[in-house]
């Protein structure tokens, strides 16, 4: 059983932001993989031979997998695992780099990932993560 009674607000806020990311990934994954008719107005990518690629389905499955990864990170964060911190840093940096490709909307992604890193690196979070 995970005891969050002593968790600092910075850890809870970081977990909440990661949970929002997980929900967003699950929603986008379901939209892309199960409801492609809703995206009928979007040009479907094709392979060089002209056959339609299953890029939307693959993107949807990848989003769902990332949603599960985010849930796993939250669980590990509440268990005070150092692997969770490494995963948070790694995925935040990757998300920020991909946010650069989507400017100006990517600025929101970059800001939220900086916020998660800032929250996890706070003094109260470091003390809580180092305690047994």
Segments predicted by a language model, with ranges:
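Topology signature of small-to-medium multi-pass alpha-helical membrane proteins
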Residues: 1-132
